[in-house]
Amino acid sequence: VEIRGTGGFLGTYGIMTLDKGRLTVDKVATDSDLKNFPAPVVDLGPDYRQLYGNSPALWVNMNMSPNFPYAGQQWAKAWELQTGQRLDGVLGLNVTALQYLSEATGPVTGAKGQTIPADQLVDYLTNGIYADFPELSGPVNDARKEFQAQIGTDLLKRAINFRGSAASLLPELQKSVTGGHLLLWSAAPDVQRVLTETALAGATSTSPRPYLQLVLNNGAGNKMDYYLTRKLTYTGGACKGQWRDSTVDVVLTNTIPAEGE
């Protein structure tokens, strides 16, 4: 719900095991279990420090950069420091990826017993669920986090144990990858080099050519991102020798209603 460079902040995490081609979900929990640090756990260089300062010392801020390999490195190291367990990789998926899994495997049940079809799941998880759990602290907030984790767990297990036609699941997974909603970082350098050549890596461009990316981070913790719309327009100017003047217009609009929910 709160924007970070790679999508949203880490609110739910899980541990999975891949053994002889079989993937199992060992544990899913909320960020309440995760212990923050006094300083960032990985030194990603002076440019990174200048941009983000000490904020990535918190688990929920380790993906402020849009470069997912940075997030993967930090989350893996933070998990090792907290638990002593070394991870082989980090898989990131957001609520849109969950929607695509629901498209293939069926609707989910909301907190009040209501049926949530796939095309309403993102809206429910980013907005509607707060009407079902109308407090942002205390036991009600904890219950909301647990319920969100339950939805994610259910959809992951459905996908892992999917017995339907691959023709219905694979296109949804492909949409997740090409849209940047399903990302993977590997702790094995050789594997990561291969991943970096694909959309699955979520890596920012290292090309020496001009490159521009709009990146937003919510530092207020207010869950209001649902009401933010973004529009970016790029206008390329005529080439003048080795140079060209271009214009980028960014419009951020607050659509919060004047009253009501």
Predicted feature locations:
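Non-catalytic, solvent-exposed segments at the cell envelope interface
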Residues: V1-E261
